Curated annotation (Swiss-Prot):
This is Regulator of microtubule dynamics protein 2. GO terms for cellular component: membrane. Pfam families: RMD1-3. It is found in: Membrane. It comes from Xenopus tropicalis (Western clawed frog). Disulfide bonds: none annotated. It is a single-pass membrane protein. The chain crosses the membrane at residues 9-27. Residues 114-124 have a biased composition (Basic residues). Keywords: Coiled coil, Membrane, Transmembrane, Transmembrane helix. Residues 157-184 form a coiled coil. Belongs to the RMDN family. Gene3D superfamilies: Tetratricopeptide repeat domain. It comes from the Eukaryota.
């Protein structure tokens, strides 16, 4: 049975009951008159009969009076039957109402809300309880399933409140992540830009250091920005400060996440920068740190040509260590670092294989390796390759200077 059919049946029953009640009330009010008229007629008939008896005549009732008596008798019988029907309806209506509610309640099982709502009384229905004797079908539905506009809009379960809180937290996290990504994007763009761009990026990174100082992605980029500042300045003290601060920042990133190849890479680079301005002892110590963290970076990210270029630089530098530097290394660390020109060359060639024309400096060191190996013609070839590349930044300009000096020695 559909909801509309239930509603129509219930309203029809109520209308019928109201009509029957009204008929009964009218009958009760008019019954004395009918009974009184019947008594008077019967009394009159008895008197007439008595007179006729006294006179010795047969009592003949008027045809109209007899017809009225017959109708009144039928009416009284109908009233008695109607009383029985009304009594039956009074007994049946509560059961029918309950049956309809049960059907509606069963129909709305799927829409019932959390158990908390079952114990909550509908305040709005209480305020109007005395005004309406029977609830409407809509009220019956809301009372049966405790689903009303009031509960839908004003009452929440723990799950709903928890979901709203979670959504708010997710929105906050998403917003913070978007801000961080914007900062990282600016850092990457500035690193690839001009010197003024790199300076602006460095200041921007310092401004966000307190906010994102616990984010590995931010920290290794900040260390990289210190490296850019190291390259751009010519003041020795500034270079040392930039390198020292960059090393400290990269070290913090490694502490937070040891599996970040970029953090290990920039820690190694800062160690290499510092070794240019330190004593022999500290230079060798930073050399060991350089190799340790560079190997870790290559292990974590073996497809980055920069790391093989740096490894080639380390191998070349170790191959050029003086006798006294080797002795100091042996005294301090037991086994001094060892590397050959051939190992350096293999790393530079790997860079060229992975990324042809990677950098002007990579061509310069290829030329140096072949020169040291006695292959001057091949060395000159790579010098020509380096000359064909434009000097896009300070590093390229420094590479050009070294290449010019190298070409002079090769042509002697």
């Amino acid at each position: 049975m559909s909801h509309s059919e239930n509603k129509t049946l219930f309203l029809g029953v109520l209308a019928g009951a109201a009509g029957l009640s009204l008929t009964l009330l009218l009958l009760k009010r008019n019954r004395p008159r009918y009974l009184l008229g019947f008594s008077e007629i019967w009394s009159s008939a008895k008197e007439t009969s008595a007179v006729q008896d006294n006179q010795g005549a047969v009592l003949i009732l008027q045809g109209r009076q007899l017809q009225m008596l017959d109708k009144l008798g039928s009416l009284l019988k109908s009233v008695e039957e109607l009383k029985e029907e009304v009594k039956f309806l009074k007994d049946t209506l509560p059961k029918l109402e309950e049956q309809i509610r049960d059907e509606l309640r069963g129909k709305n099982d799927a829409r019932k809300i959390s158990p908390q709502h079952k114990g909550i009384k509908r305040k709005k229905s209480e305020t109007t309880k005395g005004a309406v004797e029977y609830p409407s079908s809509e009220e019956a539905e809301s009372e049966g399933g405790y689903i009303t506009a009031h509960t839908d809009t004003e009452l929440e379960s723990d799950e709903e409140r928890g979901l709203k809180h979670l959504n708010a937290e997710n929105a906050k996290v998403t917003e913070e992540k978007a801000e961080l990504l914007s900062v990282l994007y600016q850092a990457d763009t500035g690193h690839c830009g001009s010197e003024p761009d790199k300076q602006d990026t460095f200041r921007m990174m310092l401004d966000n250091k307190e906010k994102y100082g616990n984010k590995v992605e931010f920290l290794w980029r900040l260390a990289r920005a210190y490296g850019d500042m190291f390259d751009m300045t010519s003041d020795v003290e500034e270079k040392k400060n930039y390198a020292a601060n960059g090393k400290s920042i990269a070290g913090k990133a490694i502490q937070l996440e040891d599996c970040s190849a970029e953090s290990h890479r920039w820690f190694a680079i800062m160690c290499g920068y510092l070794s240019e301005y330190e004593s022999v002892q500290d230079k060798i110590k930073n050399g060991y740190l350089f190799k340790e963290h560079l190997d870790k970076a290559i292990e974590l990210d073996p497809k980055d040509p920069l790391q093989y270029y740096l490894l080639g630089r380390w191998c070349y530098a170790v191959s050029q260590l003086s006798w006294i530097e080797r002795k100091v290394a042996a005294a301090l660390f037991g086994n001094p670092p060892t590397a050959t020109i051939q190992e350096a060359l293999q790393n530079f060639l790997k860079v060229e294989e992975m990324h042809p024309g990677y950098s002007k400096y990579n061509y310069v060191f290829l030329a140096k390796c072949y020169k040291d190996l006695g292959q001057k013609s091949v060395a000159l070839k790579y010098c020509d390759e380096a000359s064909a590349m434009t000097a896009a930044n300070k590093e390229d300009k420094d590479a050009q200077k070294e290449m010019d000096t190298l070409m002079v020695s090769l042509k002697q």
